[in-house]
């Protein structure tokens, strides 16, 4: 008799959650995703200042608009030589991490109305998508070669001391079976004016709500370096030829706001998931 009463109470609690909590939850998830998507998709340029307070290795300005870098005007000292890194006026650099981030948010918004009838599946799907997004925003490009670490107005990251993080985030899509491996590529040298010399390679990534600039000095056969300079290549291909690496980081206020919103949404999903799992396990135990 007591078991039947307990089961009845648990069923009523589950019904109350579905009636009073879930509608507001779905609405807040949809609104939060739309707000984050609008922020990250804005075409208004975000100007990022790269400075090196302890050294003068890297200094200048980078502008991001939506998922593209649209302006680069940076000076970099590599060895004894100072290079001017200036993106051509008509050129853009695609930030694949931000493009993937936008795609995931579009996918989440697409799934929400189609999965709401199946609470357990919808919550699980949202957990996976949001986990992938948060991993994507915190992914760190692995570094195995010698580099010079450059701080900026955002805290610099010691990549060699982050191996445990890299192992979890070098593939930020691993929690979704259909997702590809994140690949970091170089920028074609001819997109700059003047073009970068063939012994230099430049790449951008996103980490900890910052835009990260990675500059590589290369050594090797001229034909290999010329091939790298003409193409956008996977950073992994450069590693045998890297003699120096310089990293600079500048925190992006829009990425910071998006990260905060998505982290809050992730917490909401986890809280609702925990409540339903608790009710389900209690209901099972009462039978």
UniProtKB/Swiss-Prot annotation:
Species in which this protein is naturally found: Schizosaccharomyces pombe (strain 972 / ATCC 24843)
CC annotations in GO: cytosol; nucleus; RAVE complex
Family annotation (InterPro entries): RAVE2/Rogdi
Keyword Nucleus on entry: yes
Function: Component of the RAVE complex which is required for stable assembly of the vacuolar ATPase complex V-ATPase.
Disulfide partners: none
Subunit comment: Component of the RAVE complex composed of rav1, rav2 and skp1.
Phenotypic consequence of gene deletion: Leads to mild sensitivity to a range of drugs including doxorubicin, cycloheximide, and bleomycine, as well as to calcium.
Gene, per the UniProt record: rav2
Principal place of residence: cytoplasm
Cellular localization per UniProt: Cytoplasm; Nucleus
Protein's recorded name: Regulator of V-ATPase in vacuolar membrane protein 2
Keyword Nucleus: yes
Keyword line: Cytoplasm, Nucleus
GO BP annotation list: cellular response to calcium ion; vacuolar proton-transporting V-type ATPase complex assembly
């Amino acid at each position: 008799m007591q078991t039947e009463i307990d089961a009845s109470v648990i069923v009523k609690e589950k019904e109350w959650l579905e009636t009073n909590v879930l509608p507001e939850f779905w609405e807040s998830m949809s609104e939060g995703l739309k707000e984050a998507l609008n922020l990250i998709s804005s075409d208004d340029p975000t100007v990022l200042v790269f400075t090196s307070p302890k050294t003068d290795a890297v200094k200048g300005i980078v502008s991001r608009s939506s998922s593209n870098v649209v302006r680069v005007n940076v000076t970099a000292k590599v060895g004894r030589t100072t290079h001017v890194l200036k993106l051509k006026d008509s050129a853009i650099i695609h930030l694949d991490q931000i493009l993937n981030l936008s795609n995931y948010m579009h996918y989440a918004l697409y799934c929400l109305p189609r999965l709401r009838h199946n609470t357990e599946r919808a919550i699980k799907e949202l957990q996976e998508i949001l986990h992938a997004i948060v991993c994507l925003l915190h992914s760190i490009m692995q570094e195995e070669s010698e580099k010079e670490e450059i701080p900026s107005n955002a805290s610099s990251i010691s990549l060699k001391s982050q191996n445990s993080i890299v192992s979890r985030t070098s593939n930020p899509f691993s929690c979704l079976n259909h997702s590809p491996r994140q690949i970091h590529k170089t920028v074609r040298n001819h997109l700059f004016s003047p073009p970068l010399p063939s012994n230099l390679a430049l790449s951008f990534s996103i980490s900890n709500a910052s835009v990260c600039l990675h500059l590589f000095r290369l050594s090797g056969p001229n034909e290999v370096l010329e091939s790298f300079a003409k193409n956008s290549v996977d950073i992994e291909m450069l590693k045998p030829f890297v003699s120096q690496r310089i990293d600079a980081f500048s925190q992006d206020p829009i990425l910071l706001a998006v990260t905060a919103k998505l982290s809050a949404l992730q917490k909401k999903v986890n809280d609702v998931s925990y409540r339903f799992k608790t009710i389900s396990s209690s209901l099972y135990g009462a039978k």
